[in-house]
C-alpha cells in the first residue's frame, strides 16, 4: 500500500496544476501545452526533445504530439541538430513571447498565493526535503 505521503504529494501536484489550468483557461492553453511551454521557457535555449521530455517527466512520443500541436499554433520551432541529425532542438517563436509573458505572470502570481503564509525558511526546508526524496527514489530506481 502506498504511504499517505506519496498520495498527499500526488494530490498536491494534481490540485496545484488544476488551479493553474483554471487560471490559464483564458489563454486557451491545455495543461499539456502550458507545462511544455513553461519548461521550454525555463530551460536553457535550444534544448533537445530528449532533454525536454526528461525535464517534464514524460516519454518522448507523448512530447512529440504536444510539440506538433505547439508548432502548428506557431509557438515553437524545431530544427535538426547539427551534431546529430536525428535530434531536434526546440525554440520558442516570437509569436510565443507575449503568451509566455502572460502565462508566466499567471503561474508566478498563483505560486505566490499558494505559498502565502509559508516563511522563506519553511520553503527552503520543503525544497530540501523534496530533493532528498527525489534523490532516494532515483537511487532506488537505479538499483532495480
Curated annotation (Swiss-Prot):
Ranges where the HTH marR-type domain occurs: 2-135
Gene Ontology BP annotations: response to stress
DNA-binding region of this protein: 49-72
Stored Pfam families: MarR
Keywords: Activator, DNA-binding, Repressor, Transcription, Transcription regulation
One Gene Ontology term of the molecular function aspect: DNA-binding transcription factor activity
Domain of life from the UniProt record: Bacteria
Subunit structure as annotated in this protein's UniProt entry: Homodimer.
Protein family per UniProt: Belongs to the SlyA family.
Its biological purpose: Transcription regulator that can specifically activate or repress expression of target genes.
Name recorded for this polypeptide: Transcriptional regulator SlyA
Species for this entry: Shigella boydii serotype 18 (strain CDC 3083-94 / BS512)
Amino acid at each position: 500500500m502506498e504511504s499517505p505521503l506519496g498520495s498527499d504529494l500526488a494530490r498536491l501536484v494534481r490540485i496545484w496544476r488544476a488551479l493553474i489550468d483554471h487560471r490559464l483557461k483564458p489563454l486557451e492553453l491545455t495543461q499539456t501545452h502550458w507545462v511544455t511551454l513553461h519548461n521550454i521557457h525555463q530551460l536553457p535555449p535550444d534544448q533537445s526533445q530528449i532533454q525536454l521530455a526528461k525535464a517534464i517527466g514524460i516519454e518522448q512520443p507523448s512530447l512529440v504530439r504536444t510539440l506538433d500541436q505547439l508548432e502548428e499554433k506557431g509557438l515553437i520551432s524545431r530544427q535538426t541538430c547539427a551534431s546529430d541529425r536525428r535530434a531536434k532542438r526546440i525554440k520558442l517563436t516570437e509569436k510565443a513571447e507575449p503568451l509566455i509573458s502572460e502565462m508566466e505572470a499567471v503561474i508566478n502570481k498563483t505560486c505566490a498565493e499558494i505559498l502565502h503564509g509559508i516563511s522563506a525558511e519553511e520553503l527552503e526546508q520543503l525544497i530540501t526535503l523534496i530533493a532528498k526524496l527525489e534523490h532516494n527514489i532515483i537511487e532506488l530506481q537505479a538499483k532495480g
